[in-house]
Amino acid sequence: MLTFIELLIGVVVIVGVARYIIKGYSATGVLFVGGLLLLIISAIMGHKVLPSSQASTGYSATDIVEYVKILLMSRGGDLGMMIMMLCGFAAYMTHIGANDMVVKLASKPLQYINSPYLLMIAAYFVACLMSLAVSSATGLGVLLMATLFPVMVNVGISRGAAAAICASPAAIILAPTSGDVVLAAQASEMSLIDFAFKTTLPISIAAIIGMAIAHFFWQRYLDKKEHISHEMLDVSEITTTAPAFYAILPFTPIIGVLIFDGKWGPQLHIITILVICMLIASILEFIRSFNTQKVFSGLEVAYRGMADAFANVVMLLVAAGVFAQGLSTIGFIQSLISIATSFGSASIILMLVLVILTMLAAVTTGSGNAPFYAFVEMIPKLAHSSGINPAYLTIPMLQASNLGRTLSPVSGVVVAVAGMAKISPFEVVKRTSVPVLVGLVIVIVATELMVPGTAAAVTGK
């Protein structure tokens, strides 16, 4: 009975939050209210409000406010600062004319590509490769928004389509050393090499190709439906005085991430890399003009871009975090787990149930890690009691948690991309919905075809 009540409360609040965001209310305000309401109800029901890693203040009422403080410090300090730095960097690149120079140079070969959607797909594949270097979905999203997004928009790709490309690369896991993959390999009782490269990677590649094709047709359909015209920017309209080599500057963060990954050079944080990139750009500006006042005034543009990012993106991330914690403390995730364990032992049925519940949990909470970490703990027990190959259950769940995050209007990556693109999170979700669902279907079918369903098939008995 309690499980039903917790699910009902979660669903009612989720529907209410979605309704008011769709009606045009501030997403930050609506998510804050929804999250605080869930935390208050959790406290009344006797649930612990703060995560287990945090010490209570002694009172549930102050614990609620304490959690908001924790999020402000964590998301405003690390992730938030990274987002603000990326937004400030993007603003500075526009100010000094580097983005204009990229478009000016790129427009020449792009004249031979009749469809901007082909360029969009090429950008998607590049973005997917970037996920190997940047493991954070939100971090990858904001990095792509600061680098690829302006280029895509300026060469004729709609803002919605370009935002979808930046939001969706982390939906399918490629990185073999990410925490999710390591945990999934353990739950599957396989070595990391066998699990990541021999089993998961072929499925991931198939899903990425399918999602790329889906992006091509779905973004084109939505653009036609919404009467969005695609006109290549007239190069003659670009009046930038920046030298041609400035075209490399917007991509220096990506180059820095690849170089300073601990293999080719020292391992540096993305914020450190961005500081280096800003210093390089400002020094080049000084060499061009020998005008210190002009350089300092230009940097003020970057600072204002950082301030706008705090108001439009970081605070939205904090509100989304409060909402996700409210769903967690109310028992919403645990209730979904209880439902999963009540189903029978048929491998395909159990796999589909786990995929759907993991996807639902990821969509509602906005987290890819939390639902997977919660569900994956019961995989070995479920698999052994049912005679099912653990990997058969783990791989679709692993991908479903990340795919579901891309469909969540409260997930960090969707919120950050929407905020930087200045469009609604629901617009991003709409743009990613069909490609994500296509990817999910491919993952399920590929798992059924490529991964043995029974433990006996794996052991050869």
UniProtKB/Swiss-Prot annotation:
* Transmembrane regions listed in the UniProt entry: 2-22, 26-46, 79-99, 116-136, 137-157, 164-184, 199-219, 240-260, 267-287, 313-333, 343-363, 436-456
Reactions listed under catalytic activity: fumarate(in) + succinate(out) = fumarate(out) + succinate(in)
Q: Which domain of life is it from?
A: Bacteria
Which Gene Ontology terms of cellular component type are present?
plasma membrane
Swiss-Prot/TrEMBL keywords: Antiport, Cell inner membrane, Cell membrane, Membrane, Transmembrane, Transmembrane helix, Transport
Q: Which segment of the chain is annotated as a signal peptide?
A: none
Pfam families in the record: DcuC (PF03606)
| Cellular compartment(s) | Cell inner membrane
Q: Which PANTHER family match?
A: ANAEROBIC C4-DICARBOXYLATE TRANSPORTER DCUC-RELATED (PTHR42002:SF2)
Q: What does this protein do?
A: Responsible for the transport of C4-dicarboxylates during anaerobic growth. Catalyzes the uptake of fumarate coupled to the export of succinate.
Which family does the record claim for this protein? Belongs to the DcuC/DcuD transporter (TC 2.A.61) family.
Name of the featured protein: Anaerobic C4-dicarboxylate transporter DcuC
Q: Which organism is it from?
A: Escherichia coli O6:H1 (strain CFT073 / ATCC 700928 / UPEC)
Q: Which gene encodes it?
A: dcuC
